[in-house]
């Protein structure tokens, strides 16, 4: 089993992430941001990752630091669980619909952080959650997991549906990319010999 636990403590947040990449989708989430917990649940369930996240942040100011630092810590945990990246598929992609919404996520465990985020949300907030924080979450993740990530919402009228399809597709693409390829066991999936 590929397991990792990462603790991140700053003056703004205290976050603990524990992940099992070879899990069954079990989750225990307590970030203090209910909508973020809902989205993290999508990652765990659709990625089949066992995921525990506990966060304490400066929510009296706003959700920004908690959301961003959760992305950072999750990225660190995924990178730690994968290790040297030998034998992983490396690339993953997924399309996910939800009623009128459709999103595509493509990921590459290249070792080169990069984010292309194209989601034209139809409103600025989902309940009390600022939709701009989703890009901060994913930026934190890519910078600390060392991945290239393309996120495109292809259509959607309901912002909740747009967001949910993005996180579901991300979980499924992440699962695909981190799976072990039996035919490439022990090999780095790159002609360079390293990632």
Swiss-Prot record:
UniProt keyword annotations, A-Z: Amino-acid biosynthesis, Cytoplasm, Histidine biosynthesis, Lyase
Biological pathway: Amino-acid biosynthesis; L-histidine biosynthesis; L-histidine from 5-phospho-alpha-D-ribose 1-diphosphate: step 6/9
Enzyme Commission number(s) of this protein: 4.2.1.19
One Pfam family in the UniProt entry: IGPD
InterPro entries to which the protein is assigned, alphabetical: IGPD_sf, ImidazoleglycerolP_deHydtase, ImidazoleglycerP_deHydtase_CS, Ribosomal_Su5_D2-typ_SF
GO MF term set: imidazoleglycerol-phosphate dehydratase activity
CC per GO annotation: cytoplasm
Coiled coil segments of this chain: none
Lineage top rank: taxon: Bacteria
Catalytic activity: D-erythro-1-(imidazol-4-yl)glycerol 3-phosphate = 3-(imidazol-4-yl)-2-oxopropyl phosphate + H2O
PROSITE patterns: IGP_DEHYDRATASE_1 (PS00954), IGP_DEHYDRATASE_2 (PS00955)
Main location: cytoplasm
GO biological process, one term: L-histidine biosynthetic process
Subcellular location: Cytoplasm
PANTHER family: IMIDAZOLEGLYCEROL-PHOSPHATE DEHYDRATASE, IMIDAZOLEGLYCEROL-PHOSPHATE DEHYDRATASE HIS7
Family: Belongs to the imidazoleglycerol-phosphate dehydratase family.
HAMAP family with a match to the protein in the record: HisB (MF_00076)
Protein name as annotated: Imidazoleglycerol-phosphate dehydratase
GN (gene name): hisB
């Amino acid at each position: 089993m590929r397991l990792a636990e990462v603790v991140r403590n700053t003056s703004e947040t205290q976050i603990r992430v524990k992940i099992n990449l070879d899990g069954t989708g079990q989750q225990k989430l307590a970030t203090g941001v209910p909508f973020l917990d809902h989205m993290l649940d999508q990652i765990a369930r659709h990625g089949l990752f066992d995921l525990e996240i506990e966060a304490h942040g400066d929510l009296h100011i706003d959700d920004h630091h908690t959301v961003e630092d959760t992305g950072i810590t999750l990225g660190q945990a995924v990178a730690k669980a994968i290790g040297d990246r030998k034998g992983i598929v490396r690339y993953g992609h997924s399309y996910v619909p939800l009623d009128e919404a459709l999103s595509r996520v493509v990921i590459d465990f290249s070792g080169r952080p990069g984010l292309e985020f194209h989601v034209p949300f139809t409103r600025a907030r989902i309940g009390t959650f600022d939709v701009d924080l989703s890009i901060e979450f994913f930026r934190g993740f890519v910078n600390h997991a060392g991945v290239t990530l393309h996120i495109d919402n292809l259509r959607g009228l309901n912002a909740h549906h747009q967001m949910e399809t993005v996180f579901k597709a991300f979980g499924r693409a992440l699962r695909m990319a981190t799976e072990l390829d039996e035919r490439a066991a022990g090999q780095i999936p790159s002609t360079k010999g390293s990632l």
